[in-house]
UniProtKB/Swiss-Prot annotation:
One cellular component (GO) term of this entry: cytosol
Protein's UniProt name: Nodulation protein A
Assigned keywords, A-Z: Acyltransferase, Cytoplasm, Nodulation, Transferase
Top EC category: transferase
Location (main, coarse): cytoplasm
Transmembrane segments: none
Gene name of this polypeptide: nodA
Biological role: N-acyltransferase required for nodulation. Acts in the production of a small, heat-stable compound (Nod) that stimulates mitosis in various plant protoplasts.
Length: 196
């Protein structure tokens, strides 16, 4: 990101209502251009779409919030193996700063992820983001794992809809306390909750 941007880590309990309102506006403006439905969860000052993060890396510049990455520790099931991960999600960069940031947000979060004692950081992205993520993975700090379906619960329950969904997405794995060879094999990841 540009030199005028600085990152700050916030535990969820440190954020005030005004922070959530500012983040909600950021997400509506960032996700809205990708489809009205994508901005809907952020109405009424809500700053999360599915699971609520416990830690956030937030980038600021002279215009306000410039970028965001959320983190939530959780167990997921990969094939037949339970794995503790730091799920990374709710990634966004203000449209005027696009193409300048995912590596910076991960690096801002890295020292805390190390302290959390998790073996892996994990996230999912749409296939449309593949080129963007591949650039981030070039130095080997993260790995794209394709051909895996991911099952999640829906953030809200509706009488006429299933309670879960299974998606074919790109899985991004960042080894933290282990090596990539320790990541279990399997064609299905069960999140056991809503995505971050």
């Amino acid at each position: 990101m540009s030199s005028g941007v600085h990152w700050k880590l916030h535990w969820e309990t440190e954020l005030a209502s005004s922070d959530h309102e500012e983040l909600a506006s950021f997400f509506r403006n960032t996700y809205g251009p990708t489809g009205k439905f994508n901005a809907k969860p952020f109405e009424d000052g809500r700053s999360w779409a599915g699971a609520r993060p416990e830690l956030r890396a937030i980038a600021y510049d002279s215009k306000g919030i410039a970028g965001h990455l959320g983190l939530l520790r959780r167990f997921i099931r990969v094939g037949e193996t339970e794995v503790l991960v730091a799920e990374l999600g709710l990634y966004g960069v203000r449209p005027d700063l696009e193409k300048l940031g995912i590596a910076h947000s991960i690096r801002a979060m890295a020292p805390v992820v190390d302290d959390l004692g998790v073996p892996f950081a994990f996230g999912t992205v749409r296939y449309a983001m593949r080129n963007h993520i591949e650039r981030f993975c070039r130095d080997g700090a993260a790995n794209i794992v394709s051909g895996i379906r991911v099952e999640s619960t829906l953030a809200d329950v509706y009488r006429d809809c299933p309670a879960t969904r299974t998606e074919d997405v790109l899985v991004v794995v960042v080894p933290v306390g282990r090596t990539m060879s320790d990541w279990p094999s399997g064609s299905l990841i069960q999140r056991r909750g809503p995505e971050l």
